[in-house]
Amino acid sequence: MERRAQPVSAAVAPVTGRRKGAAASRKWMVVPAVGEERRVEFGKHQIMKMTGLPGRDLRVLDPVLSYPSTILGRDRAIVVRLQGVKAIITATEVLVPDHDDVLLASFLLDLRSRLSLPDAAPSTNPAAADRGNGTEQGDQGSVPGLAISGAGNAKIPPFEFKVLEVCLEHACKDLESQTRSLEKEAYPALDKLGSKVSTLNLDHVRNLKSRMVDLSGRVQKIRDELEHLLDDDMDMSEMYLTRKLSFQGLSGSLSRADSHKYASVDHDDDREEEDHDDETESGRESSVYVKPDIEELEMLLEAYFVQIDGTLNTLYHIREYADDTEDYINIMLDEKQNQLLQMGVMLTTATVVVTAGIVVVSLFGMNIHIDLMKDPETPEMVRMSNMHFWETTFGTVAGCIAIYLLAIYAGRKSKILQ
């Protein structure tokens, strides 16, 4: 029995390993700056090696985990999770998790249309082509979409900003569309509830308020994320991937040129070395206080910040209208409750008065020796007895009515009743 159990466990082990390997890899849609898009299956460690991202940043894109909207700028990539848009943006390509989703198909369609525009092609800068030697040209030419101004003043936005703009535009349009749909449905439902309070209308408004709270939370999160980026210049500077890539190439070329140029320089003059060190140190200190050039990204984020803030204001107005409708309904219900309480007071007063009349009738029903209770002996006494009966009856009723009216008057005078 033991010999038979060993091959089974050995056969199960490779299957488990393959399952773990399959679970660690995912399909990605790779859209490069130049070339055709392709579907590739990458593992987690491959993505980390390609983009330089830590594992915690990749968990932001995990469809199983629930993460809020996030934009993370890293050294070699930008991680974006906005609504249904999930992407890893580098200086040369964008990686999108491949799964069957309507939002993903719409996002890829918008991305293709944006990258197919004339400014989406790799920039061929004539001024840069005439500059320097072949090494510098090769370093600059290897970076697609490099945002270096040519003869004109306009700059071509780098590839990562084009993709980031598509992500922001897609998320903002989706939230704005949901807000407009909610607005068209909310105002008539609230007006209908204000005119007629019913269980069906209350349930409809409750569902609308749940949608509004959920939508407001998502819009608020994107707004806070954009506000956080706009407040931090260093975070925005980290998102200039193409610039950092080009600076790495230029710094490598300059370092090689400097090493060749100053290889034969005499370093015996200590004074020149001290002056050079002082200038370098002062340059470093002054560079700390220089604001990075982030105007292009700042304008992009501000535009979508204004748009998402307008969407949030629309939701705020809907919430205010819902609160006003709720206050109006509460006032109506309070008025109805006051009317019922007044009716209860009037009915209680009438009950007390009628009870007093019944007590009077009970007193007259007792066997007491008074002239009113004597049996009439003559027709004249019969007539007088009948007249006394009706006088007593009408007097009792009139007295009860008078007491009731007096009680109502006292209640109105004391403003207990309206």
UniProtKB/Swiss-Prot annotation:
**Where is the major localization of this protein?**
membrane
Motif annotated as Required for magnesium transport activity, chain positions: 365-367
- Indicate, by first and last residue, each region the UniProt record lists as having compositional bias (Acidic residues): 269-280
Entries under Gene3D superfamilies matching the protein? 2.40.128.330, Magnesium transport protein CorA, transmembrane region
What's in the keyword line of the UniProt record? Coiled coil, Ion transport, Magnesium, Membrane, Transmembrane, Transmembrane helix, Transport
GO terms in the biological process aspect are: magnesium ion transport
Positions of transmembrane segments: 344-364, 389-409
- Per the record, GO CC terms? membrane
Indicate how the chain sits in the lipid bilayer: Multi-pass membrane protein
Q: Where is the composition biased (Basic and acidic residues)?
A: 258-268
State the similarity comment.
Answer: Belongs to the CorA metal ion transporter (MIT) (TC 1.A.35.5) family.
Main role? Answer: Magnesium transporter that may mediate the influx of magnesium.
Protein name in UniProt: Magnesium transporter MRS2-E
**Species, as recorded:** Oryza sativa subsp. japonica (Rice)
